[in-house]
Each structure stands twice: as C-alpha cells, then as structure tokens.
Amino acid sequence: MLIWLADWLTQFDSGFNVFSYLTLRAILSTLTALLIAILIGPKMIRYLQRMQIGQTVRDDGPQSHLSKSGTPTMGGLLILAAIVVSGLLWADLTNRYVLVTLTVVVAYGIIGFVDDYRKVIRKDSKGLIARWKYFWQSVVALGVAFYLYSSATMSAETSLLVPFFKEVFPQLGIFFIIITYFAIVGTSNAVNLTDGLDGLAIVPTILVAGAFAIFAYVTGNANFAEYLNIPHIPLTSELVIVCTAMVGAGLGFLWFNTYPAQVFMGDVGSLALGGTLGVLAVLVRQELVLIIMGGVFVMETLSVILQVGSYKLRGQRIFRMAPIHHHYELKGWPEPRVIVRFWIISIILVLVGLATLKLR
C-alpha cells in the first residue's frame, strides 16, 4: 500500500523512490511486524487474562504441563495481525501471489479461531469437529490450488523443482492441484501438532519463512535464477515481504512465548502459519524442499501417524506419548532441552534446504 504512496510522492521528491527497493521494504516489513507484536502483545495478554481465555491442559500428559493451565491462548491473533498489517503496508497489492498468501493467512486463521473459540470460550473440549475442520481446510486449499492452476501464465509456475538434481523440472499438469492441496493442508496440520511446547513451533516457522524469503528473492530475480539454474517466476519477488513479515511477527511473538510462556498461539496461529508456509512452498516451487526444511514438523506428524497406526494394528504404542516432543519429556528431558534441541535440528535442516540452491 505504501509503495503506491511513495510512487506518487516521487514526482515531488525523487528520494521517495527508495521505497521501490525490495530489500528496504523487506527490512521495514520485518521491523513493522516485530514492533506491532512487541507493542500490542502485553495489552493482548492482559485482555486474554481478564477474559479468562486460558489453555486447558490434559491430565494424562507430562505432569510439568499442569502448571501451564490457564495460560492465555489464542495469541496467534497477534501474529496474524502483525503479518497482515505489515504485508498490506509494504507489499505490492497488485501482485496476485501476495493476495493469495494473505488470503490463506486470514482463511486458515478463521478456521483456527473457530476451533479455539469452541474449546476455550464455549468450553467444548472437542473444539471444531475434526471432519468440519478438515472440510474447511480442504475448501480453502482446493480453491487456492484451482486458482493458481487456472491463472498460471508460465510453465514454470506448475512445474516441480526436484532438489539436488540439475534441470529436472517435470510438468505437473493436473497433479499440481493435488500437490498444492497436500502442501497447504498437510503443513497446516503439521505445525498444529508441533505447537505443544513453549516456542517449539514458532522458531522453526521463523526459520522456514526466512529461508522462503531467500527462495522467493532468487526465484523472482532473473539473474540469480539463471545463475542457480532454477525457474524464474517474477511474481515471487513480492513474497519476500510476506516472508519477512512472518519472521518479524514470529520474533515478536517469541518474546512472549519463550519458556516459560506468557501466551500460547492456539490453533488460530498454528493452522494459519502452517497453511501459509505450505502456500509459500507452492508459489516458490519448493514443495519438496519444504519437507527437508520443515523436518521438525514432518517428524512430529509421523510420530502421531506411527503411534496411532501401531496401536490400532498391534495394540501397542511406539512412543510413550505422541507427538514425539512429549515422548522425550516423559523420558525425563526438561522442556527447555527438548525445545532447544528441536530448534537446533530445524536450523540444520533449513541450512540443508538452502544448500539445494547450489548443490544440484
């Protein structure tokens, strides 16, 4: 939005042309989202406490979690507000990729909000019934998938980039819709499963979003794309602004969510952040790299699938508790140790994902 104002003001002072530079707007986007989260955070936490919008803790989980009962939740609203406001201010809103991404942020945020509202405010322990949650996630994901497929103007927009292999860009055709669907819905639910310890989900989200900012920049830059031998998609450049807004908002939220957490993001945050990472992966054509960089999310999800499958088939559990972060807690690891070690794993995996730009 401000890019339009700066463009108009350029006729009076050429100095305003500086706001057309993507790198400057990326920095300002990060700082704007960070400041929004830092400044509004305390007020939101006090409001949530006053309204008694607190987390309910299961009594069959780690005993250390019982002290978390009543901690304000639905703090994801703070993250989403910071992302959307910063994105609207600093991104080019004529870019359809930006609009699609912000739509996913809001749509999945609404789904998560309804789930949290039913669980926390209406005291319905089941929240939004699973089949309805999945239904609405699917509606949004399929709507985005069909739109992106039908509006594609370049073959690169619907090709699959295979990491570590040079010049392997198979055309997906109609399978693009299927991959897009699973990328968005799958990542949304994976981040939701990961969000079980203080700061556990937000730091990998920040790291992956930061990496996608790099992918978006090089994919949208013709010179870098040619040098790295990746498809050039000009529209991805503006996604840098959304990615950096996610980084800033995430850092601001981490200020209050770090151990011991003053607020939890709730489903309104985790579902929206996961869905956004999924659509970003699709837009920058890095769905397979998302599996690498989001390895912590994948690990958490697989632990649940294996646990449920093993119990139904054999009547035995593989882990003491799933998702797997609870398994390590029940083994005696202090919560901060579990969190930081998962962060370290995430840092390593993101670096491996970034290395795919050159190692091919």
From Swiss-Prot:
It comes from Alteromonas mediterranea (strain DSM 17117 / CIP 110805 / LMG 28347 / Deep ecotype). PANTHER family: PHOSPHO-N-ACETYLMURAMOYL-PENTAPEPTIDE-TRANSFERASE, PHOSPHO-N-ACETYLMURAMOYL-PENTAPEPTIDE-TRANSFERASE HOMOLOG. This is Phospho-N-acetylmuramoyl-pentapeptide-transferase. Catalyzes the initial step of the lipid cycle reactions in the biosynthesis of the cell wall peptidoglycan: transfers peptidoglycan precursor phospho-MurNAc-pentapeptide from UDP-MurNAc-pentapeptide onto the lipid carrier undecaprenyl phosphate, yielding undecaprenyl-pyrophosphoryl-MurNAc-pentapeptide, known as lipid I. GO terms for molecular function: metal ion binding; phospho-N-acetylmuramoyl-pentapeptide-transferase activity; UDP-N-acetylmuramoyl-L-alanyl-D-glutamyl-meso-2,6-diaminopimelyl-D-alanyl-D-alanine:undecaprenyl-phosphate transferase activity. The chain crosses the membrane at residues 21-41, 73-93, 97-117, 134-154, 168-188, 199-219, 239-259, 263-283, 288-308, 338-358. It catalyses: UDP-N-acetyl-alpha-D-muramoyl-L-alanyl-gamma-D-glutamyl-meso-2,6-diaminopimeloyl-D-alanyl-D-alanine + di-trans,octa-cis-undecaprenyl phosphate = di-trans,octa-cis-undecaprenyl diphospho-N-acetyl-alpha-D-muramoyl-L-alanyl-D-glutamyl-meso-2,6-diaminopimeloyl-D-alanyl-D-alanine + UMP. Pathway: Cell wall biogenesis; peptidoglycan biosynthesis. It is an enzyme of class 2 (transferase).
